[in-house]
């Protein structure tokens, strides 16, 4: 039986990063809403509990989310983060106040007290000998009086109690966020908590996960048939392979050609799954259906909802032809859930995803989401472990709504045709351009394989169609044609990202090819926005 960490979600948009950091340490973890019952907490069997951050204030009194009392009575270690620290302090007899100075962003925290959690962990030492941590803060309220039994563990000039510890009861708390990559020692802090404080072993790995997931799918589905929407993207492909391993021919994949796919996507999907993997795949031409419903629609949320709705309708029609079809499988992963406010709807919605939004209550199929608790890098690891080809597993993410969210404003077939050709040129040149590491830089990969080219070196790259025309010159005449934006980002977890510094020569070649080969486009621009403040997709 694996050791496991229970994470209670108070609504932070980065809660699942806590789970990722715990899993990076080889320890299994799960996220549940904060309002689970005391009985659930007692019966869960956690080796430790982590309380996430959140958008609320404990000063709101009875309206504020509270930690289940059983958490503090279990006798297992507890780590509170941001709101989790404030809730811990308030419920155990401390005091919380509105801060006069809100802290959002980088901060330098001084470690105090030589606690077991922070011992010998620091980024630098001051001339006075104080250990300092470079961290990420995001809070308004702060603890101004610690509960009985707690001692100071960390501080900043604006937040005198930035960390506290009751080592007798193994309770620790930080006002900063160790789960985000901006906190340089965050991974070490969480590893220290789960290994040294909670006593967990590194016994969670992908082969074990496959065995457990396969058994769970079999128990969940029984003898029913499952229908899965196969897009050719990483998530749906890995979900299909995992479910097929579990139930074989009980799985039918439905590949919907809605006119918003990448160039030659349909051919690739059919060859890979139907011909090579032996999966039952039904291809449906629904271009007219989707384009008809999207006509005249410009609002991004409305487009996503329409695309999600039409997917579901297609699946329902197909399910009606299969008497034993009871389940609709989707490749939903953690970032989808996070950005749609996820479990319990405790967070603030950023935008809805077709996988987790737009499903009508009249849906006659139950949802099967075997990847729902996995991050993108874990999905890729799973795909490799399942024997899928490397180039498929490490293909860039493609949104469920397809090019529908890469065409700004109204979606038209002509726009999609232009965009898919421009996008194919961009991806081809990224693959054809060798990646050269900048002098003095260190390479970081998510699969341990050195980057072969700029496609490997970027986490996601694509073209975006802008429904505006610009003046240009072609030969001896003036043109008035459309604009395409190129987007390429690098990220570890898709929660935050920075724009990729592609070589000018590469960008120039891509621009020249698109303008010369895709009639109807006369201008190419490059997006240099990070996430945040922008999202990776434009819509």
Swiss-Prot record:
Associated pathway: Purine metabolism; GMP biosynthesis; GMP from XMP (L-Gln route): step 1/1
Annotated CDD domains: GATase1_GMP_Synthase (cd01742), GMP_synthase_C (cd01997)
Pfam families the record matches: GATase (PF00117), GMP_synt_C (PF00958), NAD_synthase (PF02540)
Coiled coil ranges: none
Domain Glutamine amidotransferase type-1: 4-203
Binding site for ATP: 231-237
InterPro entries in UniProt: Class_I_gatase-like (IPR029062), GATASE (IPR017926), GMP_synth_C (IPR001674), GMP_synth_GATase (IPR004739), GMP_synthase (IPR022955), GMPS_ATP_PPase_dom (IPR025777), NAD/GMP_synthase (IPR022310), Rossmann-like_a/b/a_fold (IPR014729)
Keywords for the protein's UniProt record, in alphabetical order: ATP-binding, Glutamine amidotransferase, GMP biosynthesis, Ligase, Nucleotide-binding, Purine biosynthesis
Residue ranges annotated for the GMPS ATP-PPase domain, each copy included: 204-395
Catalytic activities: XMP + L-glutamine + ATP + H2O = GMP + L-glutamate + AMP + diphosphate + 2 H(+)
Gene3D superfamilies: 3.30.300.10, 3.40.50.880, HUPs
Enzyme class: ligase
Active site: 82, 177, 179
Gene Ontology molecular function terms on file: ATP binding; GMP synthase activity
A GO CC term assigned to this protein in UniProt: cytosol
EC identifiers of the protein: 6.3.5.2
Subunit and interaction comment: Homodimer.
Chain's role: Catalyzes the synthesis of GMP from XMP.
UniProt protein name: GMP synthase [glutamine-hydrolyzing]
Species per Swiss-Prot/TrEMBL record: Herminiimonas arsenicoxydans
């Amino acid at each position: 039986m694996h050791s496991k960490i229970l994470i209670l979600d108070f609504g932070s948009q980065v809660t699942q990063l806590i789970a990722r950091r715990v899993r990076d340490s080889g320890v299994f973890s799960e996220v549940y809403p904060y309002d689970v019952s005391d009985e659930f907490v007692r019966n869960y069997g956690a080796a430790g509990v982590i309380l996430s951050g959140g958008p609320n204030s404990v000063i709101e009194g009875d309206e504020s989310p509270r930690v289940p009392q059983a958490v503090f009575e279990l006798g297992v270690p507890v780590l509170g983060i941001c709101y989790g620290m404030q809730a811990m302090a308030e419920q155990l007899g401390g005091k919380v106040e509105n801060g006069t100075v809100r802290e959002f962003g980088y901060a330098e925290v001084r470690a105090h007290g030589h606690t077991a959690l922070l011992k010998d962990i620091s980024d630098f030492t001051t001339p006075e000998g104080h250990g300092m941590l470079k961290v990420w803060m995001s809070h308004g309220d702060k603890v101004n009086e610690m509960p009985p039994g707690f001692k100071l563990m960390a501080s900043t000039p604006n937040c005198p109690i930035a960390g506290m510890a009751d080592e007798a009861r193994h309770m620790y708390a930080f006002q900063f966020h160790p789960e985000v990559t901006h906190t340089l020692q965050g991974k070490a802090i969480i590893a220290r908590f789960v290994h040294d404080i909670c006593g967990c072993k590194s016994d969670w790995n992908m082969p074990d996960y496959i065995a457990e997931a396969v058994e769970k799918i079999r128990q969940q589905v029984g003898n029913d048939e499952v229908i899965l929407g196969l897009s050719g993207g990483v998530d749906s492909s890995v979900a299909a392979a995992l479910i097929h391993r579990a139930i074989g021919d009980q799985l039918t994949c439905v590949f919907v050609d809605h006119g918003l796919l990448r160039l030659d996507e349909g051919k690739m999907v059919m060859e890979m799954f139907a011909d090579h993997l032996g999966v039952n795949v039904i291809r449906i031409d629904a271009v007219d259906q989707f384009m008809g419903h999207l006509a005249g629609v410009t609002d991004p949320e409305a487009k996503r909802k329409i695309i999600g709705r039409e997917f579901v309708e297609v699946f329902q029609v197909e399910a009606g032809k299969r008497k034993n079809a009871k389940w609709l499988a989707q490749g939903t992963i953690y970032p989808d859930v996070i950005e749609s406010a996820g479990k319990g709807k405790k967070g603030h919605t950023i935008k809805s995803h077709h996988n987790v939004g737009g499903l009508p209550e009249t849906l006659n199929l139950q949802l099967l989401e075997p990847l729902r608790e996995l991050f993108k890098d874990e999905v890729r690891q799973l795909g490799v472990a399942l024997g899928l080809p490397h180039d498929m597993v490490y293909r860039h993410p493609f949104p469920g709504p397809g090019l529908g969210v890469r065409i700004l404003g109204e979606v038209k077939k002509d726009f999609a045709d232009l965009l898919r050709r421009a996008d194919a040129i961009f991806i081809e040149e990224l693959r054809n351009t060798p990646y050269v590491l900048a002098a003095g830089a260190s390479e970081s990969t998510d699969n341990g394989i050195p980057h072969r080219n700029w496609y490997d070196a970027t986490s996601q790259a694509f073209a975006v169609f802008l429904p505006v025309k610009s003046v240009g010159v072609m030969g001896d005449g003036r043109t008035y044609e459309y604009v395409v934006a190129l987007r390429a980002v690098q990220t570890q977890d898709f929660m935050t990202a920075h724009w990729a510094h592609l070589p000018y020569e590469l960008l120039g070649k891509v621009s020249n090819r698109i303008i010369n080969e895709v009639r109807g486009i006369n201008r190419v621009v490059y997006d240099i926005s990070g996430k945040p403040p922008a999202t990776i997709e434009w819509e």
